[in-house]
């Protein structure tokens, strides 16, 4: 039996293309169910695809019918043998700290006819109340009239450069088709530092300074002195008088 030797470079590229196509497919299928991302875990026996969403019950469907349909579609689309892939639905821990969920929420608010400024301030307030350190919402397109422009709404702290951006900044981009044209939505959320790693990265920022409380020193039982001096010279002995 011939074994196909695939180089590491081709394997990494293939895994990246698979995840990108899978993410695009699930974004179209589960946009109304609060889809917030996908994670692929490969085990020796099978591959596990974890779908993160805000409404997991809608992703699963009645008696797991919809998740089985998605599994069948993924197997046919990517030529995966049966019983070698399993789909799971995981609920997003904090919806306000997920940029994809907030971008979709803003998208449906604009489709519903809500004013741009009011919709953006509502999303901004919800993100900050969820514990984010900062957020930025940008809406661009034909907001008023025929001339395109962009509106930016900022609150809190936001970093724009350096390696911590990869860990602390969550970004999402969406497009919404309205009567006047297509609007672009960009949401950036600055995550907080979380030692447990639930709501943010475990690794602190390079400029973060942690001040620890001083330890309580036990009270001394005997009086002591920090001044260290030489031992005192012996006192001169009295000399007896000679008669």
Curated annotation (Swiss-Prot):
GO terms for biological process: positive regulation of apoptotic signaling pathway; translation. Residues 195-243 are annotated as: Disordered. Gene3D superfamilies: 3.30.300.20, Ribosomal protein S3, C-terminal domain. Disulfide bonds: none annotated. InterPro entries: KH_dom-like_a/b, KH_dom_type_2, KH_sf_prok-type, Ribosomal_S3_C_sf, Ribosomal_uS3_C, Ribosomal_uS3_CS, Ribosomal_uS3_euk/arc. This is Small ribosomal subunit protein uS3. It comes from Manduca sexta. It holds the Pfam family Ribosomal_S3_C. Keywords: Ribonucleoprotein, Ribosomal protein, RNA-binding. GO terms for molecular function: RNA binding; structural constituent of ribosome. It comes from the Eukaryota. Belongs to the universal ribosomal protein uS3 family. Residues 22-93 form the KH type-2 domain. GO terms for cellular component: cytosolic small ribosomal subunit; nucleus.
